[in-house]
Amino acid sequence: MYPVSFAAFQKLIVNLSEIASELKTANGDNRTLVEWSRWYYKEFYRNPSIRARFPVKVAPCPRRTRDNLLKVPEPGGISQNDVANVAAAGPSQVEQPEVLVEGSQLTTLAETAKSHDAVEGVAVECKPSGSESPDVIVNVERCGAFIFPVSFDVFLQCINKMLLFKKIVRSIEHCLVLLSDDERRLLTLQRFYNRFYMYPEKRSPTNIFNATTEIPLEKLLESGKPLDKKAVKTVAELTAMKSLTKNSIVSFEVFKKNMANLSDIVEQMRQLDANYASKDVQECALDYYLAFYITPRIRYKYAYKLKPCTSTFKACMLSILGKDIAEKLRKSLPQLANPSPGLDSRRPNTSYITESKGSLGSQNTSGSSQIQTSPSMEVAHEPSEGLSQLATLSPENCAAGAISTTEGLSSSHNTLETFENQANLRNDANKLSRCMPALASPERHLHSSKAPEKSSEVLSPQVKPHQSKEVAEEQSDRAPQLEIPPSGFEVPMSKTPESPASKTRASDETPAKPEEITDSTDVYETSFVTDVEVDLKKHGRFIFPVSLETFRQYINYDEIIRAILVNNHIKDEHQLSKLISDPSHPQCKKFFRQFYNKFYARNDVRQRFKYKFNCPNPKMLAKLKQKAKPLDEKALFTMNRTDNAKAVNESKSQVPFTPKTTTENCPPNPISLEMFKRHVSNLDDIVNEMQKCDEYKEKSKEEVIQDYYEGFYSGPDMREKFECRFKPCPSKKIRQLLSFPPKNKELPPKNPNCQVACTTENLSDESCLQSSRNVVRETQNITEEKPIAEHESIPSTRTPSSNDDKPGEECPPYPVSLELFKSHVSNLDDIANNMQKCVEYRGKSKDEVIRDYYKGFYSGPEMREKFACRFKPCTGHILQQLLSYPGKNVNDCLQETDCLATCTTRTPLKESCLQSKSEMSLPVRRNALEILMKRKRTKVAKEAISSKPMTTQNTSQFQPEPFPEDALVVPEDVTTNQGTQPLELQHELEVTEPIKDYIQLNAERLYELSSKLKIGWNYTAHNFLDKLFKGINCPVTQAFLEEQYKRYSVSTGHIVANTIAAEENEPQLSSNSVDIESVCTAQTTATDTQATEMHTIPKALDQSSEPTKESSSVNLNNNLESPAKIKMIHAESSNNSRNSTNRPNTEIEAGSTKILEDGARVTTEGNSENENSSVEKKENQFLLERAKEIFFAEGSKDHNLKYLICTSEGLMRTIWRILYQLDLQEFSYYTSIHDGEDLYKSEDNLHLCFRHVVDHGNWPVNLCVLLPRLKHLLHSKGVQLDRLNLSKISPKIFSPWELGTYSDFDQIVAQEYIHRTGEEIEDVVKLCQEREKLYACCWAHNQWLPRAPQIANETLNAELGEVEPVIERILLKKICGVKDGDENKPTEIVSIPSSPSTVCSRISTQPAEDKLSQQPSQLNSLNFVDVTGVELASQVPQMVVDPLVSNQIEETSQVPETQYDAPASLQMASVKQEPISFLNNQRAFCDSEKCQWEHINPEEQTIDLDSTESDGPSLSCFAIQNQNSEDQIHFILEDSVHAENHDYVKKTEVPKSTDPAQLGTNVNTLSVRSMPACQVSVIPKKRQAASPRLNSKRMKLMNDKVPQLRHEFQPLPMGVKVVQSKALILPDSQNIRTSQTAKTKPTESPPHHQVNITPSQEFAVGNTLLECSELQGLLDSNDVNDGKVNKEDHPVSGSACTSKRLAASSPQSSVIYRDLELFSFYKSLTLEQIIKYRIEGPLPGATYQKALVKINDKLCNVRGPLISSLFPYLSSTLRSDLELVLHDLGEFFYKRSWPAHTDATVDFRKRVLFVFMNLSPRFAPFSIKFDNESREWGTCIEANVGDKSLDQRDTTFNAEELIKPNILNSIEQLKCKLVT
């Protein structure tokens, strides 16, 4: 029955007990291990796929026994009787197979498998128990017949219908419909029944069956099985679509939406292919979708068209599957297993053809090319998904999980029989194919070695059980390590490889017989796992020759891992030995995994490490040394990227990487590596930049230096890509450093456009005169190409692969190969995309289009003209080959001139082009060639002007590209051969010279002037000042610039007279002047625009040098070639950052070594070093003095830090405060002065700058904070920011150059320019100009226009975890001096909430200037008031003067008569100077204009306010009316005459009056005077003493001698009027209009009747002193936001009335609905909390609360009595309890979106408060006063029923002003008609 018995199976399988334990653990039942062992024994032969899930270990045994143990029985090996016997054996043996017993139509499942070839194999049950319910066959419409475990009726009996309906219904209405409609309900249940068993993987984890059912749950959870071909197709399609989704293939729905012509393709399929004629549209579309990814050949037959989409999504749409997955799916799908013959009409061209293909094929043996493997002969056995999930499923889901994967088995009986018939026909090549499976059969199934379940390899069966012993032995001798078991399955190895000790013991115990040696070798080789699939994510998917464990086992692991660890900076020997001895260490595993991936995916790693394999078998060694095989395009690109860089070097010699030394074949470099490293100053920066590239990312520093050294002397490419700077050295040494080896020496100097991009530091002109001919700065970034020397050995004939598709066509050899052509064309991708848009190339792939272009390029000039190409920088020899034609097209070379205009290189290699043209010896007349050269010269000059690519990232490095004239000189070999051609040819090539335009004339004149000697000439432009003043219309600025230019010219020896005189007279060509305007037409735009933008640029104007004996000339714009030297200093903007100004001065000092633009300079020779150094020192000194002058210039209030702090809010205010409290070290580190960095080098100057900024509070124009260090500064001060948000930061602290470098500010500039002018910015210089202009606007308005830039460099947002803020040393610094009280008197500090828009300022008590001697970071005492030092009679707030506007304000609290220098219009009169006391035994009624006084009876006199037994009736005698009139503002200002003249007017004293009647009269006669025409918006501040200069009236209060109330409190003022602070910020027009309206139109409104209430009754309400309304009014007068007004009972006079427009200036709103978003409460503030939450105002230790509410869908921060305002419905007891809980917590923070009440870890008190605030009603009437129109901050006020709303609007209007006259006439006519 089975190959071996169960007893033999137990002996041979070593880990059988472990497998049985694992099965028992996974199922969790009560069966024994013996039963599970027997079950596994049966399944081992019945279902071979279980071997992959549970790998076995075979004990040492003879080979024949091992083969017999592992073989797979034949399909007919187990008879039906055996099946019946097994079924009768009971559960202890093996499970009973599924038997269909329902009716006569049902047969056993095994018979069904024979009759229906679609069913492959027998399903496996996980639990060996019999089934109690028979299986049924169900025909599902359009899906085929399936075998379900239970019938539909049984399923309905076992299902919980209500639970099911909750899962599947869409709504309650849908559920009711199902319950009421029986037919619909049954139909829905039937569909669910079908889906439940057809698609078991889509089941919900919820158990929908009843708890008690007759059918076991395992039976109910079984999955259905397909019965016919249609069902198999349905399951296969579902599996295929799942597999496509797993492999990142788009779904079918997405495919249909994005395939534009899918309907056309389906129609073509139905018309052209008979297989799809009978199918409907949906089926054809699904077949095309599956074939599109599984059989990609269909893409070539039916041309597809995608809808517009992104490149990433397009790549996803066009991706393909791996060969193994596609082959598996192709076999499982019937419609794709045998595709239509039409698909074979066009075979796709493979994309794996590379130049390294030959080397790969050379590693194979000679017999490997004869292997013919048919894909249909291979059977890929996939491990069962159900078994892989066996251990993770629950017991009730175990059976369903195992059975649901039956369709995954793909081994059919017919395939096995085919292998049996052809087994004896295998030859030696078949054995070799088994030895080298990766090369012979690449399409076989492969498994990844990453997952433990798939670590073992499953191979295709190549050897049958009855194969001869000789063949097996021969196979074992050839490649025992890759031997494939004859049963078709390799013995899977264990998860960990065998240790060497165990293998040694096994080899020692084995006898020396050949058979036994072979057997032991088999056991030894079981751990050699080959051909594993590895996914490297973005680098692609590969097939590696061996697994990671096998690789680690054979390679010299200890040496490799030591080298890797040392390279990663692990130097400690103890740590190294510890890591090396532990391969399982995560760090070692990570590094070795990376080495393993790079070893096979990249070739350069093998050259950098000395590896060796401990493998005696040569075939195993060859397998270990193989390369990886790419499986997708990313992998192919990864391998080609490394192969292309090393292709030529590998062809010369295959040697490991060693530092190259001087050999006979390679000429020695001019200097050694050590000397090179000593002379290069920026070598570390170059190494860092190179290591950012993929090519050098994994190399060490020394290796990168070696590569740069070799590339530096191999060609100009490395010098251009990575610019180097040499240290100061003699000119001889410079020439030696810049020279090339003898082999390459003649190339770079003769090619002026391939010269070296290097600079030197501090080189003199004399030492650099010779090197200047070889050194030119290139501004254009050129990508790295192959060294020039690599291309010299490339043959000019094409490779055999260039026309492989047309072997029969005779085609002449092309000049270069296709691969070389592709590597030198820079825009090949763009050409291919443009060609694919044409009709003739539309259906072709990219490779085919490139091949067609390659052929057309060398077939004639048509292709070159139609699609212009650009070549990368290369030598003239290579360029000649690229532009030449094949032999038969030599006559077409006459078109070469046209090709020169289109096939341009990225760096203009004009000399190379001309040299290649001249070598063809074309007969051209001299005049024609000269005309051609002149035209070419003019064209190149135009291109230099107009076609410059603008870079926004490195604008500071922009430099106009030089145009060397000698590149277009007529070659001598062409001119000397003229006249030797036939006369006919000369006549044909004769070219007539056209009329020269002005550009050509200028270019020719420029060339003529450049070739002449000019001694002692000074070039001065006649319109120089016009260009200097371009864009500046201010005469003052123009005069300033002209004066600066004159001063600079005089200091440097220039003669200014010629320049100024040239403005009026036209220049004449003479020995002293040249027409620069006409000559410089062909000049680059950079020079003109730089001269234009020299507003204050004395540095940009170089001086002329004295002529010498040798021929010399001057450089007019010597310093204009680099924008780093452009110093555009505006009067209102800052300038370059330290990054741009911190460059080495090598560009200035070695300025004469640069080859500049023609027409902008004339070369100078013989200038002395001393003269240049003195000039440079003068320039630097002038710039330094200029920067110092700007820095210490007198600035306006916008440049004052105190003003900026007062007018800023939020984060910006915090930053200004931080900058205001910097210390000296922080100031020098975080800030920078434009053009004044040298000021920081001197200690004296640094202290001066520090005192000017920090001590005196100035912020100069040219001072900025370094943007890269801003986050570090904030972090060190305790301000935690995840990202820098520039919208919350003022533009004043940044530099425009840093904004252009680190943000998208340049993009905003470009967009704003386009929006304003409709044109794009042409060059970088224009961009710099516009950047300065826009930044100046942002500076002037102190805000970003039109939008705030975003940080583009993410390095600025990097985390700063190591920098911890030092809170202990942070002290908040005072802005203004606060009046000090008596030192002996205790000071009470009251916290006053502040808003961002208003700041309470105090006038300094010092006579001249502020005394700012506090420590940095000291707390801002601006918002805190000393209550004990406040005069009680001075509580009426005066009009506050901004301390930043007037610095001469003086005050004193000791002498009332002290004058101060504030304008008279800003002063207010104070009231009663003596203390106010309460009346005694008197009460007054102010119901009219006069006060009526009444005596209090003796029995009513004694009132004990401290008594708790006082009640309302006992206090009714003290009732006074609480008036509720509108807020009145009484400004007593001086006349406008005094306000304008600022005269000192002495105040006349008003005699005191104790008459109460006179007091009432005086109060009612107060009037508001007209406000001045120019009203200054000021900020209210604390009450000051009355000024003696004020000529105003005083309020007369009560007599001091009246009877007093007897109580224990301090006497309180009862008649003081507190001015509302909000009215002080009214606009001028509104204030004036209000005053006028109050004078002309008095309002006589009757007083509002209120219930009389006495002061004692008000005191009794709160029972606390602080809740007293009168005292609270006095306290609130100091607050800038919460000012209250005492109410009066008498009617106000007309002069004191306020217009309704006053409400608009002080926005107030009555709110009845709000959403509480945030609420915070702090019982006692700490310094850390103030800094962390940016709390403004309160001192440490004060109580603080704030809320964020949403009113009318807008968020507002509110302050004030929050608890009583937000929760007015609370009783006094509940409110006190709430306050008690908050004080008990100490700190509480509520957020509505945070469900803290559900978190059990949160404090219970906080959870209760969260629930309370969540459930609090949102309807809560209260009033809120907003700080300004933005309504971001406000103060809440409890809303009273009697209060009159302040935001009433006047609804009256004039209809005639709003309605048109014709409409009014129509209304009147209609009214007349209606009346009549």
Curated annotation (Swiss-Prot):
Key words, A-Z: Chromosome, DNA-binding, Nucleus, Telomere
Region entry Disordered, spans: 333-385, 441-519, 779-810, 1098-1178, 1629-1650, 1679-1699
Classification via InterPro entries: Tea_C, Tea_mid
A molecular function GO annotation: DNA binding
Gene name of this polypeptide: tea
Subcellular location: Nucleus; Chromosome; Chromosome, Telomere
Described function: Part of the MTV complex that associates with the HipHop-HOAP complex to form the terminin telomere-capping complex involved in telomere maintenance and prevention of telomere fusion. As part of the MTV complex binds single stranded DNA in a sequence-independent manner, protecting it from degradation. May mediate recruitment of the MTV complex at telomeres through interaction with components of the HipHop-HOAP complex.
Chief location bin: nucleus
Positions with biased composition (Low complexity): 1110-1122, 1133-1145
Gene Ontology cellular component annotations, sorted alphabetically: chromosome, telomeric region; nucleus
Name listed for the protein in its UniProt record: Protein telomere ends associated
Pfam family, one: Tea_helical
Domain of life: Eukaryota
Compositionally biased residues, Basic and acidic residues: 442-456, 467-477, 505-516, 783-793, 1681-1691
Ranges of biased composition (kind: Polar residues): 348-376, 1629-1640
Keyword DNA-binding: yes
Keyword check for Chaperone: no
Subunit details: Component of the MTV complex, composed of moi/modigliani, tea and ver/verrocchio. Interacts (via C-terminus) with moi/modigliani and ver/verrocchio; the interactions are direct and require fully intact moi/modigliani and ver/verrocchio. The MTV complex is recruited to telomeres by the HipHop-HOAP complex, consisting of HipHop, cav/HOAP and Su(var)205/HP1 to form the terminin telomere-capping complex.
